[in-house]
């Protein structure tokens, strides 16, 4: 996230995908690339540069960042940024990844054509908690569960630092894949990831519902090889997602078991803060509440809390120590 003028944060809420014509120019970014996903001809690759919170394709990611700046502020801005050299970058990274993986995010900007004055790395759960309106600097323990597109990060925060954190390779995409597999098994129907996502949005629930709700989906019949339409129920979607949801619950319980008693009292009192785009799934809060006995705080725009938190860290000198220079010895 680059440093814009005070109080105007251009946030991008779009798919982190990039479409590249093989070995040539980038073609599309974000939602536009997503619309090509699974429809593109062989010479167009749709890549996901970040997988499970870690950079999987360095070149694609670098291209994507440069394109974002062109797209966000126009070509002039991008060229000015490359020439001017006074940009400040703040990058939120998962806490539970290796030092090398964290450094890769730093290198991404440092080795790009963007001239930078300052590159800072922020632990994502800290930015997340700040953006969610929690006071991260005091001695109170806060439990934050961020269920995103590709990962779920469960973190215990106190005194501006991370006490415990677990990063799971479970998120919206994993739910979509599970739905795709289950529909294939149950209905002999091959559906695309976008159709799976639509089923999730229409039918998913954190808690098994008594009432049956249905939604029609198009796909290719495995036996005949022909296009086919089937009616999928919410119960099937619940079955598809239950394993992933159980893993999230287990990880939350794991963090709670490892929480020091003083901080446990804080969490009993304040509950769990839920963020990330996947918290839009119906009854997911109810599931966590039932399984842990804790109250749940939900956000208005759960997918934007990290970005908001980064903005606060940039603008408020009191939060300076939450942003690390990778040369610092205090950053692990």
Where are these regions (language model features)?
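Positively charged, low-complexity, intrinsically disordered RNA-binding extensions
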Residues: 152-153
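Nucleotide/phosphate-binding catalytic cleft detector across ATP-hydrolyzing
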Residues: 1, 5-147, 156-272, 279-306, ...
């Amino acid at each position: 996230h680059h440093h814009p003028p005070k109080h105007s944060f251009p946030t991008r809420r779009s798919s982190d995908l990039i479409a590249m014509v093989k070995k040539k120019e980038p073609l599309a970014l974000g939602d536009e690339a997503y619309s090509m996903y699974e429809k593109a001809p062989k010479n167009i690759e749709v890549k996901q540069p970040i997988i499970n919170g870690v950079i999987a394709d360095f070149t694609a990611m670098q291209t994507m960042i440069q394109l974002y700046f062109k797209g966000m502020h126009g070509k002039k801005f991008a060229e000015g940024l490359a020439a001017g050299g006074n940009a400040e970058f703040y990058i939120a990274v998962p806490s539970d990844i290796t030092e090398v993986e964290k450094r890769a995010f730093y290198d991404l900007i440092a080795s790009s054509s963007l001239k930078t004055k300052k590159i800072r790395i922020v632990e994502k759960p800290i930015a997340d908690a700040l953006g969610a309106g929690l006071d991260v600097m005091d001695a109170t323990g806060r439990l934050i569960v961020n269920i995103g597109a590709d990962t779920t990060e469960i973190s215990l925060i106190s005194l501006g630092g991370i006490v415990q954190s677990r990063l799971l390779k479970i998120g919206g995409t994993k739910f979509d894949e599970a739905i795709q597999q289950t529909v294939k098994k149950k209905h002999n129907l091959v559906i695309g990831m976008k159709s799976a996502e639509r089923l999730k949005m229409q039918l998913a629930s954190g808690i098994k519902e008594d009432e049956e709700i249905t939604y029609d989906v198009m796909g290719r019949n495995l036996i005949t090889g022909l296009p086919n339409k089937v009616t999928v129920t919410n119960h099937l979607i619940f079955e598809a997602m239950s394993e992933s949801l159980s893993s999230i619950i287990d990880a939350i319980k794991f963090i709670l078991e490892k929480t020091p008693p003083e901080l446990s009292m804080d969490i009993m009192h304040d509950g769990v803060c839920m963020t990330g785009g996947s918290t839009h799934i119906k009854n997911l809060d109810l599931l966590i509440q039932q399984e842990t006995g804790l109250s749940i705080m939900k956000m208005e725009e759960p997918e934007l809390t990290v970005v908001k938190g980064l903005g606060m860290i940039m603008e408020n000198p009191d939060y300076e120590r939450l942003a690390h220079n990778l040369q610092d010895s205090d950053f692990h």
